[in-house]
From Swiss-Prot:
The species this protein was found in: Rhizobium johnstonii (strain DSM 114642 / LMG 32736 / 3841) (Rhizobium leguminosarum bv. viciae)
Positions of (6S)-5-formyl-5,6,7,8-tetrahydrofolate binding: 24, 81, 121, 439
Magnesium found in the keyword field: yes
Chain residues that bind K(+): 228, 247, 249, 252
Family to which the UniProt record says this protein belongs: Belongs to the TRAFAC class TrmE-Era-EngA-EngB-Septin-like GTPase superfamily. TrmE GTPase family.
Subunit details: Homodimer. Heterotetramer of two MnmE and two MnmG subunits.
Cofactors, names only: K(+)
Sorted UniProt keywords: Cytoplasm, GTP-binding, Hydrolase, Magnesium, Metal-binding, Nucleotide-binding, Potassium, tRNA processing
A Pfam family assignment: MMR_HSR1
Originating gene: mnmE
InterPro entries in the record: G_TrmE (IPR031168), GTP-bd (IPR006073), GTP-bd_TrmE_N (IPR018948), GTPase_MnmE (IPR004520), MnmE_dom2 (IPR027368), MnmE_helical (IPR025867), P-loop_NTPase (IPR027417), Small_GTP-bd (IPR005225)
Record protein name field: tRNA modification GTPase MnmE
Enzyme category, top tier: hydrolase
Chain sites annotated for binding Mg(2+): 232, 253
Amino acid sequence: MAMLSDTIYALSSGAPPSGVSVVRVSGPLTRDILVKLVGSVPAARHVSHRTIRTRNNQPIDSGLVLFFPAPNSFTGEDVAELQIHGSRAVLAALFHALGDIPGVRMAVEGEFSRRAFENGKLDLVEVEGLADLIGAETEMQRRLAVEHSAGGLSAIYDSWAERLTRARALVEAELDFPEEDDVPGSVSDAVWADMAKLRSDIGDHLAAASAGEIIRDGFKVVIAGAPNAGKSSLLNALARRDVAIVTEIAGTTRDVLQVDLDIDGYLIKLFDTAGLREADDKVEMEGVRRARVALRDADLVLLLVDMTKPLIPDDLEQSSPHVTVGTKKDLTEVNSGRYDLQISTATGDGLPELRRLIGDIVERRFAGLSMAIPSRQRHKDSLAKCLAALDVALSQTDVNLELRTEQLRIAAEYLGRITGRVDVEQLLGVIFSEFCIGK
């Protein structure tokens, strides 16, 4: 990461050409830049229409200029935003003018958010939530990201850290001043009862992490069945485009194909797999192996059965959770007792019902779930280590209190690593590299 003393600039809006582009500037030279480019510093947080000029007083463009003085800005530094016409030529001219000013340079990925973190405007969970909000494609992803970026999840972790700090303070006070009247007598029982409750709270919270990961990364639905059961046809029908090759030749699908769907606000990752059968062809054998791997990782299996020649591979009947879908409804009489649903990809019959069924299954899984849940592996890892330290502190009742208190300190440190309250330098490059240049 380059020096935070530099003044940086970048395009913060979408790639040109566009109707409007927003260029953000942050750093100690922001006021000087505004004087050079637009003649003076606009009133704080008020929109001002200005002509932007080069150092030779040649006009670049006219647009809206805003100034946000430190510390009341996104980065905590002096920040300016220039809203100009979004042509490549205008942006190139403005960037050339900015780059000519000593001490001013183009920002690197995530540098504005990095400065916001360094200046205490955002913690790491809020930074990650902001990245997720920018990348959100479904309604549930948006809700999860808003909760995280607004500090809802951080507030939970901060409250837990405060409970750990208070517990350590009370135990250490009893250790240091056992004879003092103003130290509550025998606080241990109350402290450890609260730590047991905290351990339970964190355990319940960690158990919800899989839901957070599914909302963020997608609910995996695997289409499986015997060869020619209509798996690829269903993938194409649900995707509303030709993703998979469809032929009457058994074994056409040799690999796992995937498309993303938005069903009722949830990201659904839909996988088409090779037909499950004993194969002699090495390529098809590999496809079958990959299909079985996908089945193991599935959140839901759509078990397709060709109703004109019903055949279910033996190991698929035990797939759980699964929905049995009868296919080729247009070619045979419906056997409603055997199937959860019957469809025809040729006529579209049953496809809206299948989409609703998938949506209902996902909705039931997340019904009543708070969005203040962990959604990243690093959150889970730190929470698990926090729990492990609490387990040691709670279980080792026969050891010195100082040793048990040390485990509380370790537990608090792992909570602090989630929000960045403790040293997490090695994580920062990874986290901020997820952002675009202008964020």
